């Protein structure tokens, strides 16, 4: 205790001393700091500077030192800087390896498609929320023909609607009871029954609430005044029901007030008959003669019989008032087979004939017709035609493709031309003109005049014309010899033919056959061709004179002129069509429905009962399948002419998918009961159905696992385009991302490229306003605009809609009409989302959208595509287009149009990116697929050179293993020579033994670590992304984690090329950066992925196989094998050599079993053009023989491609899959419906139309056609559209082909006077 007391004072003293020492040190430091600060303030630092001469000397010496050391650097004398650089690189590489730094590549974010793409609207037809009465809505929804009335007319009809209550079993009408009415079921269920010959009743259709029962043919009978009771059809209530009944007599009052509406309604009924009834029964069920009544429907020719027999044969009389003066040449040449055809055969096989007179004769006729003459139309008659979109007659003329000029310009009317007389020479292959005068008139010609006048009187009786002068100048008498083909099935320009003497045989081509069957005979007093004239649709049969025949002919234009003055003439003509239909067609007319589906509405849902089959008439449908986990997947899309739901209906299975409308669509509905009745009545229909199902199964077998139309059948003759969403595209809308996008130039370039595939129409808001009036986009004219746009789809291969830069009514219309929307942006701009895109995203737009990025020719390569796509979950794909300089030229619209006027006169470049886009949009893409095979793949580089030299375009590239490497180079490089250099450099690097030795590792997973191989691949492609490639590309790998094939279309290019080349045992599997799955060489599962390219939309796949061929001639060693015996056979030089696989070879063959089977399927498919260079002598690692192997591939490619060119394979590749390539670009430009006879174009050639009634294909093409007017007349003989570019009354008649029945005559040169017949 005492020691502790002594220590405490000492510790206290030490602490006090330490504190004093610290305080003293702090005071000293503070004092020194203050003195130092005062010293600095007292003496400021002097500011030194260089004198100017010293500065010049300093920089001069520095520059001289650089110059002095530069030569030493160039000759590598100074090793120190290079050594430092190498050391720095090695240190950085070592640090990366130690620290495992990984470069982050931009990745495409996986996004679910927008709900509007895969989901149908949940709300069905809403009656409660409408301001109209339910009965009115039901009637308007069901009866297609009523939609063609204006609102006041329709409401007036609805005044006649009555309610009828039915008990179970009660009949609406029974056989032999007249029931001229339209019935709509408000609640309950009706059954439509057909009575068989044995008296049994068959239910062909069940009518549920909201559906209707009516026969448009029966309604037409009421309208024409020929009502007749139904002999075999009855309708009864299956349960207590309430129906709405609209008597057909209510139509009479409306038609008396609005006679033009009569024309329109009759035309729609005729269109339904041809499009719905004949399409379903003939094209799909193969019925021909069963559809027509072969009994004579002739009227007695009282006037003709009263004229004395005898007439001058083979003369054509257009009138008796005026005659042609004698021309300088009595005979002119006639194109024997304009547009191409096949030689005629005996029997019903007919020669092709086009109704076009010789150019020289046409010129003389036009000169005569320019003189004023009799027959001028009545100035008080109403106007019609495309420029007059406000009248029903104008709408009817639009559908029939007839242009009736304003009566203010009588000189331009077809009817205002003086009528002439032309004689067809005796020799069928020549056409001569007969000069006549009133003084030299022969007895024969006077008799023909008498017969002509008498025949016109009989025709007046049949057509029920009140004014005989309506036929003056509009009817021609033709005398044709035996064997003459008057008109051909599929011809657009039809005429009404009234037989006076002889017979006209009517033939129709059998489905799936080259044979024609005779439908019926047209006897004296009967008409033929009136259905095609009324509807404007192509002819559904061929008309041929098997014996000498005389008949009156009224062209389509003349008939519509008559109809404009007396609309009721349509009733008599339509009645002759109905009388020609068989009783079977009348029965089926009750069962068939014409259905309109709004965008987003489901026609059926997955799991529903399959009670009918649908046929696409217009629009677009999408099929979506719901998986067990609730996820939805796109199963396919359907376009015009496709069969929908036929498989489930025939197999009586529930609906496998949900099908909804992408846009407003029209469908024909064939109930299952009606199909059963048809099969019972005509058993041959079963054979046709088996054929359809067999095609479906065969297509599925050839395709393998596909993603497209799982349950759809395409149209007759088309291929199974199962995975291509661009199949059957009819309309494409283009819209800009920003105002800087040259959208007008882009649309014109695309139209130019599409014109090489088929007739193309470009529509803009200005164009629509010019053609249809400034009020065409108003809601009042909604239906008329939709109808007119639908007609443009009928007549063109594809219609382009150019949207405005903002969300205008026209932009909304473009989106509504589009099967596919192209969003156009500039690739060199910052990735952004346009305001127009944001506005559209808020609406349910179901059309698939594609992103199109434009690039300049001299600009940088595509980059940052991933950023563009990540901003747009609604885009299903993208394309990069390298545009010519003219696209980005800053020209005013007139100058731009003037420039493209010259562009359209040249054929498009098939290798341009715009042509690639055109082929993709029309389903005509050509894919290049490269197989795996190690060093043998160097031959693919040579084949690519031959491919370019032979002019074969490539729209898609895919590959496996070495094929993935070569394909990636081809897709990235636009220059072949540069691609070859890069491929050769890489191949030379693969021969380095030192690099291979340094990459060796302990062989647990593989012999090599893969680092050296990775660096060689990365040195070729750098940081390139698959999305940035010029040509769409995919690579194939084998996912050993999921035991599945992987198709890579996005991500790091070098990564997936390396994965596709990872041979088992040599390289370790590569981990997919997306999901961590292990990826191996794609050759194990699909070494030649032609089927993948096909499923991605290719029409033709060029497949280059370089794989090794296995030895198949192996030794049969029995049921046991001794390794010692094999060792003895191998070591003993005197023993017979045996071929037995070792363990490694057996494992390799097992790995490639799936690949070999897939290769055989691809080689046997009809879409694949298989190519294999002779490279079996080279091994997998012979990369040192790059030049030699490449040359082998080049020589083989040139040989094969030359054979393709001579045999027509190349032509078949470039031909449109929906039919032969229509015209050259110039022909399409002159007349976009080049395969049709456009009467508007005919008249405009004689007299240019008023600006308000322009009938061009776009506002840009107006200027184009002005220049083409100066082309010599003889040049038009080379176009198939000749008949659409000249106008005269003789358009259909004077150009009839007069040929020997069994000979096809070559073309005659101008001035030739004779030809052997």
UniProtKB/Swiss-Prot annotation:
Domain called PNPLA: residue spans: 928-1094
GO cellular component, one term: endoplasmic reticulum membrane
Listed EC numbers: 3.1.1.-, 3.1.1.5
Positions of modified residues (Phosphothreonine): 1262
Record-level GO BP terms: phosphatidylcholine catabolic process
Region annotated Disordered, chain positions: 320-357, 370-392, 1271-1317
PROSITE patterns according to UniProt: CNMP_BINDING_3, PNPLA
Subcellular location: Endoplasmic reticulum membrane; Lipid droplet
EC top class named in words: hydrolase
Catalytic activity: a 1-acyl-sn-glycero-3-phosphocholine + H2O = sn-glycerol 3-phosphocholine + a fatty acid + H(+); 1-(9Z-octadecenoyl)-sn-glycero-3-phosphocholine + H2O = sn-glycerol 3-phosphocholine + (9Z)-octadecenoate + H(+); 1-(9Z-octadecenoyl)-sn-glycero-3-phosphoethanolamine + H2O = sn-glycero-3-phosphoethanolamine + (9Z)-octadecenoate + H(+); 1-(9Z-octadecenoyl)-sn-glycero-3-phospho-L-serine + H2O = sn-glycero-3-phospho-L-serine + (9Z)-octadecenoate + H(+)
Keywords annotated in UniProt: Endoplasmic reticulum, Hydrolase, Lipid degradation, Lipid droplet, Lipid metabolism, Membrane, Phosphoprotein, Repeat, Transmembrane, Transmembrane helix
Function recorded in the entry: Lysophospholipase which preferentially deacylates unsaturated lysophosphatidylcholine (C18:1), generating glycerophosphocholine. Also can deacylate, to a lesser extent, lysophosphatidylethanolamine (C18:1), lysophosphatidyl-L-serine (C18:1) and lysophosphatidic acid (C16:0).
Record-given protein name: Patatin-like phospholipase domain-containing protein 7
Organism: Homo sapiens
